[in-house]
Amino acid sequence: ALNIGNSSTVQTLIKHDQNNNGLSEEFFGGGTQNGRFVHTGEVINIANESKWVDGMVSSPSPFYYTTNGYGVLRNTWQDGSYDFGATDGNVVTAMHKESEYDAYIFVSAGTDGSEVSADLLDGYYKVTGNPVLLPEYGFYLGHLNAYNRDAWSDTEDIGTNWTIKGNAAYTEPGTTTYEEGGTDYMITAGKNAETLNGTGPSVATDKVPANLMYEKKFSARAVLDEYLDYDMPFGFFLPNDGYGAGYGQNGYNMQGGVGSDGSSSEARLAAVKANVANLKEFADYAAEKGIATGLWTQSNLKPDSNANTYWHLLRDFEAEVEAGVTTLKTDVAWVGSGYSFQLSGVKEGYDIVTDIQNTRPNIISLDGWAGSQRYNSVWTGDQTGGNWEYIRFHIPTFIGQSLSGNPNIGSDMDGIWGGDPVIATRDYQWKSFAPQMLDMDGWGSYAKGPYVHGDPYTGVSRMYLKMKAMMMPYIYTNAYAAANIDTGNGDKGLPMIRAMFLEFPEESYAYTEAGSKYQYMWGEILLV
């Protein structure tokens, strides 16, 4: 039945006790439904909630399907909710807040749940686009923090304490440095300024505080070197992930320089150019070490026409890509509005990287919609780490996201907040069997890195990261299949993280929450 009203349209379909293959009918999809993967008997929201915890939605998709052989993609940008038998066990109702019905309906003649899922996902991809095949480095551990804003000391407690124990025992005191700063911090005279390369600005320096020091040990380069010194397999580095950071200090605290027509003055553009050169110096250094460089997006991708914008925060993404940037993290500061805004944003970033560098980008985003999968991976947002709940709810989240048509997924290692040595180590262990791993540093009670807590934690984390590196041919083959590319293995279109029923479709228990919520197949042959 179809009920089209002034403010909502509801499609009602029969819910069957069994599917065509004699097993219970089960429902999947809906995008990143945190903590859930099978929705039978439940209600899910198709809305950009921008909430990152269990039961909430961080990247919705108006697409669902059933093991009974059909799927529905609503062609809409409007919020909705899908009731898979929670209110009435005999029917499924799919509602969107609009006064029309526009949908794609997919059908499958598959003989089991795995074939049905592959068929319906293939139909979904034909309409919305195949999932992006990330560059290989995107499946290694990445590091994200701000290195162009705060003040540091290794002798004076000026703020947050960060202790690194490295290869020493966890009982040892380690080495502690101290950071003063945070969101939109402005450094003052006479302090040690963090930088990308251990060098200060040279253009538009009128408002740079006096007597600042620029030591390499407080630079992004030094942190990159730490990963390598501790022999940690490592793929990409974002040196500007933090509000008020930027990637150079030329034009520090300078404002103005905008004409009546919105154009920038030569001095304003010179500061941007000098900061891009600073970024290129870092990107070249990272590339020599085999590490890709990326950027976090807080502001426009072009120098804006707002005279109040500090010059050191201005962006020129095309110039950044020419400087070597191939990773882009589009945070809520830029794409938080979701829906078509998110899709347009990630497409713009994708097109710029592919046009200028002629390479596949690593775009990390959230608050997406149907179609986002052809441009970006999904990260699940900002969660508190340091507890088992963080790991628990991410396992079904990853399974459900993968069943929803976006196989490229990741989250912060041990969350962005909090932190605990045991939880962090367990996170490095299990996510070595997952697509993306993000060391989101600078926000928690501990530094975020696999060498932070000392042995045995450092050694165990290293071992699993090396295991992932050794398995990269297997992982990348599965990434090809997940991108809907035929690898000759009979798994075209199946995600990297596979719900148990995708590999064991004859087992009814594999379709259920009880049977598959906390385990999955990592490709065809590895049980996690």
Predicted regions located by residue number:
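Aromatic- and carboxylate-enriched substrate-binding clefts and catalytic-loop regions
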Residues: A1-N19, L23-F28, T32, T40, ...
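Catalytic and substrate-binding clefts that recognize carbohydrates or anionic sugar/phosphate headgroups
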Residues: A1-S202, D206-K207, N211, L224-D225
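Catalytic cores of large soluble enzymes that bind and process phosphate-bearing ligands
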Residues: K51-G55, M95, I105-V116, V208-S219, ...
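Aromatic- and glycine-enriched glycan-recognition loops and surfaces
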Residues: V53-V57, S114, W152-A307
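Short, solvent-exposed loop/turn segments at the edges of secondary structure
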Residues: M56-S58, H96-E100, A323, L403-S404, ...
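Conserved, mostly hydrophobic/aromatic
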Residues: F63, Y227, D412, I475
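Alpha-helical packing segments of well-folded alpha/beta enzyme cores
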Residues: L120, K216-V223, F282, D316, ...
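Glycan-recognition and catalytic regions of carbohydrate-active enzymes
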Residues: Y457-L527
